[in-house]
Regions:
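Walker A/P-loop phosphate-binding motif and the immediately C-terminal alpha-helix
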Residues: 3-40
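G-domain G4 guanine-recognition motif of GTPases
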Residues: 10, 143, 168-182, 205-212
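Gly/Ala-rich phosphate-binding loop of Rossmann-like dinucleotide-binding domains
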Residues: 28, 132, 160
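P-loop/Walker-type NTP enzyme "switch/lid" segment
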Residues: 37-111, 216-218
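Inter-motif core of Ras-like GTPase G domains
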Residues: 108-111, 125-146
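Anionic-ligand binding region
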Residues: 146-168, 178, 183-184, 188-191
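Beta-strand-loop-alpha "switch" segments that mediate conformational coupling across diverse proteins
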Residues: 195-223, 235
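NTP-binding/hydrolysis catalytic cores, primarily Walker-type P-loop NTPases
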Residues: 217-258
Length: 258
């Protein structure tokens, strides 16, 4: 049985991809078979943090050049990875049929992973929402900035009203302290609960860190380059809580027939 977890955000620049990559690697290092799908279509860059340059991507699959299993790359840490590619015009303008083809194709994988982490494009674009609704669990990354609050709220509102999603995990990124992060979550939850009947689960925070910035510059993930650091421990702690997020029952097609 595969648990699919979408990592998303209301706006870009909040560290969503960094979190998705490090959580996927954290699970892999715990000996959990994990697949990372970069579904930030046309703007895919998770491979940069992994320090790899995949030969193939979803673009090859969509064009009919390769089967999905042929575009899966295995990293040196044994993480399975599917690149979203950088053919912006092709990937940003996918039809509903093409998006559904991508989703249903994952069921053809012979050896199903225990977890699939999906790096979703920021915001409430159609392609992002389709992949979100097809995941079992959704995690929203936000920061303490007012614009991040507004955009995250808008994303959750759209997910709830248009796609019947009502369960969301929340990660506060770029925080100055655990206390400040929790206060930011409490404030966001209070605002959200005034208008939407949704469940928000606080999973933890990732601190503002020069080490994380350096790891991005050096094309590496801090979970592997600084495995004993407080930052790596923060990712490990969050990865241990992923299953605490309730599953959404959207009625949408799913990546795997569990």
């Amino acid at each position: 049985m595969t648990t699919t977890i979408a990592i998303t955000s209301g706006k870009g620049g909040v560290g969503k991809t960094t979190i998705a990559v490090n959580l996927a690697l954290s699970l892999t290092l715990q000996k959990k078979e994990t697949l990372l799908l970069d579904a930030d279509l046309g703007m895919a860059n998770a491979h940069i943090l992994l320090g790899i340059n995949p030969k193939h991507s979803l673009d090859d699959f969509i064009n009919g050049d390769l089967e999905l299993t042929k575009v899966i790359t295995t990293t040196k840490n044994n993480l399975k990875f599917v690149s979203g590619g950088n053919a912006i015009n092709n990937l940003l303008n996918l039809s509903d049929l093409e998006r559904h083809k991508i989703i249903k194709s994952f069921n053809d994988i012979t050896k199903k992973p225990e977890f699939m982490i999906i790096d979703i494009g920021a915001g409430a674009e159609a392609s992002s929402m389709t992949f979100m609704a097809s995941a079992d669990k959704v995690i929203v990354v936000l920061t303490g900035e007012p614009t991040s609050f507004i955009d995250a709220y808008t994303l959750i509102k759209t997910s709830f009203l248009d796609y019947k999603m009502n369960n969301f995990g929340i990660i506060v990124n770029l925080s100055n302290s655990p206390l400040q992060a929790k206060l930011n979550f409490d404030k966001f939850q209070s605002i959200t609960h005034k208008f939407l009947d949704v469940n928000l689960k606080y999973l933890g925070h990732i601190p503002t860190s020069q080490k994380i910035k350096n790891s991005i510059i050096s094309r590496s993930a801090i979970i592997t380059s600084e495995s004993q650091s407080p930052e790596a421990n923060a990712f490990n702690e969050i990865s241990s809580k992923l299953l605490l997020v309730e599953t959404n029952k959207t009625g949408s097609i799913k990546f795997f027939d569990n």
